[in-house]
Amino acid sequence: MDLGLRGRKAIVCAASKGLGRACAEALAAEGVDLVLNARTATPLQQAAAEIAAAHGVRAVAVAGDIGDAAVREALIAACPAPDILVNNAGGPSPGRLKSFTADDWTRALDGNLRAPAAMLAAVLEGMAARGFGRVVNITSSVVRHPIDVQGLSAAARAGLHGLVSTLVREHVGRNVTINNILPGPFATDRLISNFTFQAKQKGISPEEALAARKAELPAKRFGDPSEVGRLCAYLCSAHAGYISGQSILIDGGAHPQIL
């Protein structure tokens, strides 16, 4: 299926690896030119070069912490009229409520609520004026199915979902959609970090913790980041203009539900 995206322009955050990189790859495969962001310059520049070479698109790297207003301004300067925004950020470190410091809360909210909110504020008006816009927020399944050591992530990301719910109706009539993807367990560095923390608590090795979790999953495997990438690309497509305000769980059936 041609997604009708060739020649469009996208900003993709946290794009040097993992789910962000997968979203960038999937969009580039559809002919979308990219402006990519991540904290560390070298891997980001390498990702941009590899994506551009593989797909024949323009891919520009803007390194820095998306929580920094100057970095957000640089992203918009590099892509002043984006058609697509993929908000994505590394999640906060796992822990228990009593262990969270004021700095922990600030970092969690800056990266997973304030920064994506600021990016939304920067792009939505222009998208609406041009008559096309697609925003995809990569959040987490913990918004719907909390994990006891993911309190910071659940709190910050749930806040973003709440904000999105107030914006959808205002913009969908001008062909601007905003959706959330809620990944479950995917084979990323983030997964390994989380299970290393849990393994330490349980007195087992990270490998044992990962194997036990995989055995519990209905799919008997962790998700591949490309599966999130392809879902993201479809939500950004010309065919998805009637899908907005949705929070789509992609977790291999790990969390049973009726609605």
Go through each PLM region and give its residues.
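Conserved glycine-rich cofactor-binding loop
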Residues: 14-17
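Conserved glycine-rich Rossmann-like NAD(P)H-binding loop of the short-chain dehydrogenase/reductase
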Residues: 32-46
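Substrate-binding pocket helix/loop in short-chain dehydrogenase/reductase
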Residues: 96-97, 104-109, 213
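Alpha-helical segment proximal to the catalytic Tyr-Lys
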Residues: 125, 169-170, 241
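Catalytic loop of short-chain dehydrogenase/reductase
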Residues: 136-159, 164-173, 185-186
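Short C-terminal tail/terminal secondary-structure segment
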Residues: 145, 233, 244-259
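Short, small/polar-rich loop/turn modules that mediate ligand/substrate recognition or access, typified
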Residues: 172, 177, 243-245
